[in-house]
């Protein structure tokens, strides 16, 4: 999606089902409900190609035992965001904290990485906000130390109270990071809020104010975080 980012299943981008053509699944990603029938994910998750010119022929969501169709409502190439709608009605929605992130605060990534290998259950990783900007001082993204892998794309990044502070997007290639550990990024919740406002989607302003223990945080996030499958 951007020069210097993995375009395979290693970090951040959809997981590609290269060896399972009978399923006709081109890739998978993660999304989360921002209203009862609207879902946010990355724009590249709902496209068949790296250039994001060809949309998935069909998009399916899976949340627990429920599986449902998804349809693109709006997309923003520059910020790599997409809004999807479904006839399925989900009662739990994400709480989005628009107030800016702080360097050093805890961050949790929830998503469905490498679902063909690791299974379709949601996975969580923990880290810190490493920087308040992305590559080349990109102010719409921020750097995190929490691991994200192929299939995490589009998933929520949470603070220690369970509020969404960003959207998982990608990792930097190792040759750009000096050969050390992979550097990961998220789209800021402020950028997400602007995208939702443009599409007249209201935010749940009743934010969580108490620090949650991690099992509770994960349990709540799993109720609005879904696996997204892109079909050719």
Each PLM stretch: what is its role?
Residues 32, 147-168:
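Catalytic nucleophile loop of clan PA
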Residues 18-42, 67-69, 154, 179, ...:
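A conserved glycine-rich beta-strand in the N-terminal activation segment of trypsin-fold
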Residues 28, 34-79, 88-89, 102:
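Catalytic-histidine neighborhood of serine endopeptidases
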Residues 45-50, 92-140, 148-152, 168-180:
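Flexible, gly/ser-rich surface segments that form the specificity/activation loops bordering the active-site cleft
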Residues 21-23, 44, 84-90, 96-98, ...:
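A structural micro-motif recognizing beta-strand termini
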Residues 1-19, 58, 69-74, 91-92, ...:
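C-terminal cap/linker of serine protease catalytic domains
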Residues 25, 33-34, 75-77, 88, ...:
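Extracellular/periplasmic catalytic domains that process cell-envelope and extracellular macromolecules
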């Amino acid at each position: 999606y951007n020069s210097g980012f993995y375009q395979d299943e290693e970090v951040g981008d959809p997981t590609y089902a290269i060896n399972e053509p009978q399923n006709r699944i081109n890739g998978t990603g993660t999304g989360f409900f921002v209203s009862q029938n609207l879902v946010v994910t990355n724009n590249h998750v709902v496209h068949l190609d790296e250039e994001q010119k060809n949309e998935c022929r069909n998009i399916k969501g899976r949340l627990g035992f429920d599986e449902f169709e998804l349809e693109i409502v709006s997309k923003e190439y520059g910020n790599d965001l997409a809004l999807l709608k479904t006839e399925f009605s989900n009662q739990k929605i994400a709480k989005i904290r628009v107030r800016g992130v702080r360097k050093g605060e805890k961050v949790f990534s929830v998503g469905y990485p490498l679902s063909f290998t690791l299974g379709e259950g949601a996975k969580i990783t923990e880290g810190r906000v490493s920087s308040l900007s992305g590559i080349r001082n990109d102010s719409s993204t921020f750097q995190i130390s929490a691991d994200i892998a192929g299939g995490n794309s589009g998933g929520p990044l949470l603070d220690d109270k369970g509020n969404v502070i960003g959207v998982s997007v990608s990792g930097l290639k190792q040759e750009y990071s000096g050969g050390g550990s992979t550097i990961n990024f998220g789209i800021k919740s402020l950028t997400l809020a602007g995208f939702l406002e443009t599409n007249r989607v209201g935010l749940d302003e009743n934010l969580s104010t108490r620090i949650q223990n991690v099992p509770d945080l994960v349990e709540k996030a799993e109720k609005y975080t879904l696996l997204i499958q892109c079909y050719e």
